[in-house]
């Protein structure tokens, strides 16, 4: 257990969070998918919706035999829209999936596997140019579809790390990503706790899938698990408004349930939310 004064050391804080959560909750089985292309589809569909809705949309694509680049390519745009309708923003998402497949066809012969064989920085740069792909979506594709050693920053990880004072309220996406990657560089994922050692309060995890169980480099597996653990923590304990710290594996690391929620941090969060809302409005008009 780390002393509370050590919470100002971002790397040490991140490592302690990872160790505690992985011991308490075990493997998270992310990403729940059967192929790299399914991961890509899920990364698009999960934008601005719950994973439950994504699962409904993916089930529709699978039933239609369209959960592949060829399947998306051959579908009419209206048919694709209807299949992914449960995920919300279905017209924009259908257009973006079509554009991604067109990119895949023009650069990599329609093969997502060929794309993912390229260097991490090269793929990331290409993905970020595409309509509807921001850093979180690009990094989800890289980490979960291609096993590239890159951390996915989302609202959950940002919230947890802010409250534990590992990052500031106005930290940029890549700043947070690099802090986590640096902190977990030496962690090993080869030894995992058995189910008998897990906390009785362990949240429900996804069933193991072909993609979640694929062989990975140890560092990639750590980054994979860390993201899944942050998601669980954000959903079940570190809520936006009323965090449930009493049964949280990290509860004793904070002197107050929400940490030092200073006026400066609140102003920074408000400014970031306002900026994100403007950016979201701009993107969805494209």
Predicted regions and their residues:
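Acidic, low-complexity intrinsically disordered tails
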Residues: 267-286
């Amino acid at each position: 257990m780390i002393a509370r004064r050590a919470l100002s050391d971002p790397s040490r804080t991140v490592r302690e969070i990872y160790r505690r959560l992985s011991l308490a909750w075990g493997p998270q089985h992310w990403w729940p998918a059967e192929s790299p292309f399914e991961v890509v589809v899920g990364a698009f569909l999960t934008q601005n919706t719950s994973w439950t809705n994504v699962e409904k949309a993916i089930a529709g694509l699978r039933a239609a035999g369209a959960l592949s680049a060829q399947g998306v390519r051959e579908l009419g745009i209206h048919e694709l829209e209807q299949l992914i309708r449960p995920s919300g923003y279905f017209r924009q998402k259908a257009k973006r999936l079509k554009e991604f497949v067109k990119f895949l066809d023009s650069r990599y012969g329609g093969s997502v596997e060929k794309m993912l064989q390229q260097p991490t920085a090269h793929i990331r740069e290409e993905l970020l140019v595409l309509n509807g792909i921001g850093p979180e979506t690009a990094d989800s594709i890289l980490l979960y579809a291609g096993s590239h050693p890159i951390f996915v920053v989302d609202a959950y990880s940002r919230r947890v790390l802010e409250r534990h004072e590992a990052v500031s309220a106005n930290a940029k996406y890549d700043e947070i990503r690099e802090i986590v990657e640096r902190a977990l560089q030496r962690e090993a994922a080869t030894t995992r706790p058995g189910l008998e050692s897990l906390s009785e309060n362990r949240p429900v995890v996804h069933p193991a899938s072909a993609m979640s169980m694929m062989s990975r480099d140890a560092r990639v597996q750590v980054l994979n698990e860390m993201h899944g653990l942050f998601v669980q923590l954000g959903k079940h304990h570190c809520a936006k408004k009323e965090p449930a710290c009493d049964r949280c594996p990290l509860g004793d690391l904070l002197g107050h349930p929400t940490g030092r929620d200073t006026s400066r941090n609140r102003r920074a969060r408000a400014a970031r939310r306002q900026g994100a809302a403007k950016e979201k409005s701009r993107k969805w008009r494209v």
